Amino acid sequence: MFPVFPCTLLAPPFPVLGLDSRGVGGLMNSFPPPQGHAQNPLQVGAELQSRFFASQGCAQSPFQAAPAPPPTPQAPAAEPLQVDLLPVLAAAQESAAAAAAAAAAAAAVAAAPPAPAAASTVDTAALKQPPAPPPPPPPVSAPAAEAAPPASAATIAAAAATAVVAPTSTVAVAPVASALEKKTKSKGPYICALCAKEFKNGYNLRRHEAIHTGAKAGRVPSGAMKMPTMVPLSLLSVPQLSGAGGGGGEAGAGGGAAAVAAGGVVTTTASGKRIRKNHACEMCGKAFRDVYHLNRHKLSHSDEKPYQCPVCQQRFKRKDRMSYHVRSHDGAVHKPYNCSHCGKSFSRPDHLNSHVRQVHSTERPFKCEKCEAAFATKDRLRAHTVRHEEKVPCHVCGKMLSSAYISDHMKVHSQGPHHVCELCNKGTGEVCPMAAAAAAAAAAAAAAVAAPPTAVGSLSGAEGVPVSSQPLPSQPW
């Protein structure tokens, strides 16, 4: 497209420009260059062009750009809103930091033990007086009111403060609460005897104990022999042990375990497994792994037999023994355990083992401390130890018996429902309390008069007078 000039150029270009037969040279001659100018081709061309358009009635060359309008003065830019919010944001951050510090201090105070109560120094009379009214607020001047930020700025500032404070306070308080929860939480009642570390179950405890001992934790084979654990009687004074037998609570299982294990109660089986027995008997010092077995063991120290057979009225100390006895009345007792020596059958494996030790075995591991006798079972050793105890006479027949068997011997004189006691004149099938008291008094008198007879020759009295000895009477068993 050709530019449209402000002047009318309807004539052919050559006559108008004077470019007829004379050519460009004629045009140059019609507009001679001005005098005093340097012969610069560009300047000469520009002057010729301006003269040409001036002769044609154009005030300005169409090829020259219009002069740019003068710049209009602009109003100074208003300060951005962020400049006004800088003090508000700074105050919000300071308040968030103060809130986080206050939350951390409150958590530390809650975790610390309570301090002993001190004497109060607060004036209670002053507390009962009504509080003084607050001072009136200072008047607000008009320029200050005009200088207040607009509502939109206040809304944005409040939103910014809320967005800054909420996450900061949550992040500051959450780690403190989680740390306190981890510190106070207990893992379990299984405690390592060497480093006091707690575990939830016995398997994890055994795996941990393998680190201290170097032994590989594993299952105990079925044929492994468990060695009995004896607790020193000095440990019975520990509060955890004395309460473990009666209550059986979790406190005795937790705190008492560490105390007993430190005293050497942890035993090791033939396979290398360590067994902790926390509950000790107060009478003999034998330890057990739980309260159930301890209470069952305590029945052996008493004459109580709470379980009675409904068929023959025979009494038992343990319920399982009574159940096996009741099955014998029906003739349906299954005895799968056979002795390889004599072919005798038993209903329980412990009965078979006891039979083999007592009848067929020549090993005598239980030895008497007062003589050279040895026995295959602990029960037989206990029965033999009674021979070395003090003898008491029977008030009926005068036979000298041990104090442990005097009650059983009195039943010999009171067998049958038609027996009449010589002391109370009552017919009874049990031991008379008056007869038992008389036997105890006679035993005390006999012990005060003379020393108990022994199987060794004769003994010397307190004043050197020999006391005649008599042979030991036959035992009721």
Curated annotation (Swiss-Prot):
ZnF (C2H2-type) ranges: 190-212, 279-301, 307-329, 337-360, 366-388, 392-413
One Pfam family per UniProt: zf-C2H2_4
Subcellular location: Nucleus
Any coiled-coil regions, as ranges: none
Biological process according to GO: negative regulation of apoptotic signaling pathway; negative regulation of transcription by RNA polymerase II; positive regulation of cell migration; positive regulation of cell population proliferation; positive regulation of DNA-templated transcription; positive regulation of gene expression; positive regulation of phosphatidylinositol 3-kinase/protein kinase B signal transduction; regulation of transcription by RNA polymerase II
UniProt GO MF annotations: DNA-binding transcription factor activity, RNA polymerase II-specific; RNA binding; RNA polymerase II cis-regulatory region sequence-specific DNA binding; zinc ion binding
SUPFAM superfamilies in UniProt: beta-beta-alpha zinc fingers (SSF57667)
Residue(s) carrying Phosphoserine: S361
Region annotation (Disordered) ranges: 59-78, 121-146
GO terms under cellular component: nucleus
Tissue specificity field: Present in kidney, liver and brain. In the brain, highest levels are found in motor cortex and midfrontal cortex (at protein level).
Main localization category: nucleus
Segments of skewed composition (Pro residues): 130-141
Keyword ATP-binding: no
Keyword set, alphabetical order: DNA-binding, Metal-binding, Nucleus, Phosphoprotein, Repeat, RNA-binding, Transcription, Transcription regulation, Zinc, Zinc-finger
Subunit (UniProt): Interacts with BPTF.
Protein name: Myc-associated zinc finger protein
Source organism of this protein record: Homo sapiens
Gene that encodes the chain: MAZ
